[in-house]
């Protein structure tokens, strides 16, 4: 995780953060990075960060601690408290980016890598065609996080993650094709898109 709070900026956030990553890697453990000058021209963020691989879900947020630290009584108690507040979540087998979660009801969150506007257009096409759900699910909206749009469907009460693999695998090509389509939206599709956008929130 890299964050920067500074009054100085080169105007290229990608270069600024990449420079801090490179300088931070060279620091001894526990030492803070002090920045007093703007970075010289050099690698940008996309040049130093590997492309995204598989997302790994953890049952307890101890992945950022050593095993020794996680075993300390005070840390173990804090970790268990954090775990109790997490939303139970599981990846849907065979459907990239889809995650089942259980709150007051069951939902599936589908992280989409495509540009936001393309995803919204695709969802609008399916909604206008009344082909907008799978296995008795109900589209409830979308949220944005880290620049990605994440559509959300509410599932039948009690639905489990392993029940979603087949219906979502059948629905996925329809959504992919609708997102990839480049035809202008029809008036009906534009109205559907406006309804979807009105239920979109941004998580910061």
Regions found by a protein language model. Name each.
Residues 1-64:
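N-terminal membrane-targeting/anchoring modules of bacterial envelope and secretion proteins
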Residues 73-104:
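Aromatic/basic-lined ligand-recognition segments
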Residues 136-137, 142-204:
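Alpha-helical oligomerization segments
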Residues 99-109, 146-154:
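Glycine-rich, often proline-containing surface loops adjacent to acidic residues and nearby aromatics
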Residues 122-142:
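Short acidic, Pro/Gly- and aromatic-enriched capping/linker segments at domain boundaries
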Residues 3-10, 112-115, 155-157:
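Secondary-structure transition/turn motif
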Residues 12, 36, 40-43, 55, ...:
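Alpha-helix boundary/N-cap detector
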Residues 103-121:
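A short acidic-to-branched-hydrophobic micro-motif
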